[in-house]
Regions:
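Canonical phosphoinositide-binding patch of PH/PH-like domains
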Residues: 185-223, 228-240
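Juxtamembrane amphipathic/hinge helix adjacent to a transmembrane helix
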Residues: 45, 50, 219, 226-267
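Alpha-helical transmembrane spans
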Residues: 52-124, 248-320
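Membrane-cytosol interface motif
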Residues: 130-144
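Acidic, metal/cofactor-coordinating or nucleic-acid-engaging core segments within structured domains
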Residues: 166-175, 179-185, 194, 215
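Phosphoinositide-dependent membrane-docking surfaces
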Residues: 135-136, 147-172
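Short, non-transmembrane cytosolic segments of multipass membrane proteins
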Residues: 1-41
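Short, hydrophobic/proline-enriched secondary-structure or compact coil segments at domain edges
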Residues: 43-57, 182-184
């Protein structure tokens, strides 16, 4: 991967870390594409198209967990306290009572929105790369917890010749720990220029950049040569089962096919990390249960018929 110290795209991504190799630059067929996590986002690949999942970039179940924990806390403590001290709140100090109720309503609304967003977000928002049409097809879901607007599905279609890639980096410090996450971003430019018209997050929430480098190389190889010159990877399991969901955040002890695949790809560095994180099972298991609830409630992605056919078979359909 040829990285840069200065972005070539305008406007610059606020979280920009580095540009990746240009789409039309020379492809190194000897580059090793052996990251253990390279296949965790592979939905499908054949002679016509490659479909990349984006589920690994979203921590599903967290919104449901927040909603459940808040509901239990409110029912066991907040509402009983309001009832028991009704006279003090609304007779002796009515302004304090109004403030308490306003805060309670706001917290209830926020927790409900987190849980609702977790359950309404589609199970996947995939991106398809078609070699025949030389286009990419993006399944987006527009939803904002900060703005009250209609949550909706949006399909974006761009020419492959418009696509470049960059790495974004987000870091934060709590004073005791330093957290870093990287993201592979597809940069959509105006034809023949580096003027950005859109940015699409393809894979995020990665601690290191190695898998992101290899994923971009994998996509470029597929679009240039087809499946013959890319590693033979096994597509991820796309169903939702209770057991696999329960161990979703602890795949190293999962008795499912996903667990066996994860263990077969483990490297020596994974073992000390597992040793440090397994003691938080009291968080991972409830979060896995909430992951199951969110994914069962979530709608499956449904492409419009014409776009779905075009993105799979490679024959451009007439779209209104």
């Amino acid at each position: 991967v040829t990285a840069s110290s200065r972005t070539r795209f305008t406007p610059k991504n606020p979280s920009w870390y580095e540009d990746l190799a240009a789409r039309e630059s020379e492809i190194d067929l000897n580059e090793r594409l052996d990251s253990p996590a390279l296949d965790e986002d592979l939905n499908h690949v054949d002679e016509n198209y490659l479909e990349i999942s984006r589920t690994s970039s979203v921590i599903r179940g967290l919104g449901v967990l927040i909603g459940i924990m808040y509901f239990l806390f409110a029912v066991s403590f907040l509402f009983p306290m309001l009832i028991e001290q009704w006279y003090d709140y609304f007779v002796t100090a009515p302004w304090f009572g109004l403030y308490y109720c306003t805060m309670l309503l706001g917290a209830t609304l926020a927790a409900s929105l987190f849980a609702l967003h977790d359950c309404l977000l589609p199970r996947d928002t995939p991106v398809r790369f078609n070699r025949n049409t030389r286009k990419i097809y993006v399944y987006e879901y527009k939803a904002s917890l900060r703005r009250l607007q209609r949550w909706r599905t949006e399909i974006k279609i761009y020419d492959w010749d418009q696509v470049e890639a960059e790495i974004a980096k987000v870091s934060a410090s709590t004073g005791k720990t330093y957290v870093v996450r990287h993201e592979l971003v597809l940069v959509i430019c105006k034809a023949g220029s580096n003027e950005v018209i859109d940015r699409i997050s393809l894979k995020g929430n990665d601690v290191t950049v190695e898998t992101l480098y290899q994923l971009w190389s994998y996509i470029r190889r597929f679009m240039a040569y087809g499946p013959a010159r890319i590693p033979d990877l096994k597509a991820r399991v796309q169903g939702v089962s209770f057991v696999s969901s329960l161990f979703h955040f602890m795949p190293y002890i999962s008795p499912t096919e996903e667990g066996r695949r994860f263990r077969s790809k483990m490297r020596w560095l994974d073992y000390p990390i597992i040793f440090l994180t397994i003691w938080f099972f009291w968080i991972w298991l409830p979060l896995g249960l909430c992951y199951y609830i969110a994914m069962k409630c979530a709608p499956e992605p449904r492409w419009p018929a014409e776009v779905g056919e075009e993105s799979r078979q490679g024959k451009e359909a007439s779209r209104s």
